Amino acid sequence: CRDSQALSQPNVPKKNSTTAVSLAILGLVAALLAWRIVATNMAELIVQDGGEDAAALALNWNKKNAQAQFSEGLRIAKANPADATAYLSSAIRNNPTDGPAYAAIARLKEDNGNLAAAEEAMQAATQMAPRRVDVQLEAARFWFRRGDIARAMGHMDVVLTFGDSLRDELFPVLLNLAEDPATREIAHAKLLKQRITWWPQFFNYAAAKATNIETLRVLFQMQTGGPNAVTTKGLQAYLQRLQRENLW
């Protein structure tokens, strides 16, 4: 009878043991979460600090840090294009809206001769970063290399609109296109069908720097009657150039 009563008693030690295991698991999970937070924060700090080995050090803390993957991909791009592409692809997986990473992949694909993949990557880059000046400038240069001047100028418009500090550097490129009869129309005529915020400044630049007065005349005609009508300063610059050439 005593034996049957003993058997019917609850096993208190088992309950205590289960509770202890649960607490241990919770403690382990909390520790892992805390470590993950520390590792993530350390990786971010290292990347922000910069330095030649910053990306590699950051990846030691957090292998999924997209910025570190991007930076490491750029660092080794020339020496090891395959590994660079792998890093950049991982950066995109961890940050699918990373326009600069797509642009970097496009350049690697272009250098490797895979032009279809390069075009696809560059298109993704500009879609993900529609107003990032660095990405749009890379896209403009890409399409210039591909011979698609009209498409390149569409990206150049974004660059010159949002990156006005680059105008002094890029206006000579645009003027060269305007000076060449083979590229003048395709580079500027289509663009001038819409409002271009930087056009008045460029026209004034062209009035002063164009080597051929015919270039200026054509640009003047292109803008006439459209949304980029000549400004007062532009007209003055145009007339002054005509006077300088003894044509007015």
Residue ranges and their predicted role:
Residues 68, 101, 135, 169-170, ...:
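TPR alpha-solenoid repeat register
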Residues 31-53:
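Hydrophobic alpha-helical transmembrane segments in integral membrane proteins
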Residues 78-79, 112, 146, 177, ...:
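Structural motif corresponding to the intra-repeat A-B loop/turn of tetratricopeptide repeats
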Residues 60-66, 96, 130, 164-165, ...:
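Short coil turns that delineate tetratricopeptide repeat
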Residues 57-58, 90-91, 124-125, 159:
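Canonical positions in the second alpha-helix
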